[in-house]
Curated annotation (Swiss-Prot):
Domain of life, per lineage: Bacteria
Taxonomic source organism: Maricaulis maris (strain MCS10)
PROSITE patterns (UniProt xref): AA_TRNA_LIGASE_II_GLYAB (PS50861)
Main localization, broad class: cytoplasm
Keyword Cytoplasm included in the entry's annotation: yes
Name of protein: Glycine--tRNA ligase alpha subunit
UniProt-listed Gene3D superfamilies: Bira Bifunctional Protein, Domain 2, Class II aaRS and biotin synthetases, domain 2
Alphabetized UniProt keyword annotations: Aminoacyl-tRNA synthetase, ATP-binding, Cytoplasm, Ligase, Nucleotide-binding, Protein biosynthesis
Reaction catalyzed: tRNA(Gly) + glycine + ATP = glycyl-tRNA(Gly) + AMP + diphosphate
GO biological process: glycyl-tRNA aminoacylation
Assembly and binders: Tetramer of two alpha and two beta subunits.
Amino acid sequence: MTAEKAPSFQELILRLQSYWASKGCAILQPYDVEVGAGTLHPATTLRSLGPRPWKAAYVQPSRRPGDGRYGENPNRLQHYYQFQVLLKPCPTDLQDLYLGSLDAIGIDRDLHDVRFVEDDWENPTVGAWGLGWEVWCDGMEVSQFTYFQQVGGQDVELVSGELTYGLERLAMYVQGVENVYDLDFNGAGMTYGDVFLEAEKQYSEFNFEHADVDMLIEWFKGAENQCMALLNLDKPLPLPAYDFCLKASHLFNLVDARGAISVAERASWIARVRELAKGCADAWVKSERALAEAAE
């Protein structure tokens, strides 16, 4: 870092939002359904499909119940934040745009070693994959960028460029701290731990010890049935159906965190969620094509 004071966690977010807004992105809000990664926000998963261009950026809280450590691990969380950017079609200067965002948050590339390490991305739960790279700053992974090839089992019509910033990890790097809970949250004396440590403790206890497995399994079946019902309408409703696909995915993650799914069963659960995602993607693409044709 330069001599300039490192940005707080919230200032880091504001700078990224301002930067990507200046590049023509719609700055969206977090999706209000639990997701395991920012990519699963419909502004990325669904909007990456179909023929219409799209440029958006947003913060997304992500929940991975099995990653909780009762607030005792300095860099592993069951609830954390990602900053997502989706550019469709992908611009030819995506890498330069990304490097410009590092400048915006105060990383002096003349003083730090920024490298792109090939690492293709795949999310089998939603039938998605793409060609990608991890971005490393001084040996620490801080971002991932991906050229989507397939989402929900559908080949993309326009290749999208997706950027994912791990906000906590990036902030730890920028601020030079070793423990996520020591992060300067707002530049006014509040730390990340002041905001989130108690939640990490309580949700870890819930995820591993108290989540009612039988109830969660019934909820999973209900979400699965509702998703399929919405997709089987004469005029399918892919957006609300996708909400229930996301709910099913999160419920699976909770049951998995409780240790209630065997290795053999796990593949079956993932396949069920993937089928929901594929159904949502198929219905979305059909609706997008119809809208594009109507606009011609």
